[in-house]
């Protein structure tokens, strides 16, 4: 079993990470070659999300229990919720001789970039084209105004980390962004 190629796709909320990763996995070549990482979180499930497909939703007590047992490759608290990447994803990718695509927050991406156990890691920072567009996307997701403002402030901080990522992709439209990400992922995986 060789070390899997791991891709971390990070960026501010509203940049389109989840949508792009979902569309990437509708491509046969991607499905055959990669495992999709599903994050564990304590945040409230949005109406369109499915437990086990988009995230594994747990309460804070369960999350902290898993963290104490070293269940996660990395875990972070973002705003008022915890997020964690299960170690088992990396092991399953390794065992299945597949790559791994993770859609995680910026702090988590930086933690994995420094992790010596992950030998083949490519980081991709996904950004919205403008602050106004980011705000519009968050509003469309029906987030509360107070939450949107917190996320916009967080996005400003997260954008400062884009220079540490291997790639910066601006999500102006889904079709072009998907093509660009697919080219990066398939190109780097060779």
Where are these regions (language model features)?
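Small-molecule kinase domains that catalyze NTP-dependent phosphoryl transfer to phosphate-bearing small molecules
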Residues: 143-184
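Walker A/P-loop
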Residues: 18
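Conserved phosphate-donor/acceptor-positioning beta-strand/loop module used by diverse small-molecule
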Residues: 101-106, 118-141
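ATP-dependent small-molecule kinase phosphotransfer cores
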Residues: 39-100, 106-108
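Post-Walker A helix-loop "phosphate-sensing" segment adjacent to the P-loop in P-loop NTPases
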Residues: 26-36
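The feature captures the helix immediately C-terminal to the Walker
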Residues: 21-22
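Hydrophobic anchor at the beta1->P-loop junction of P-loop NTPases
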Residues: 9
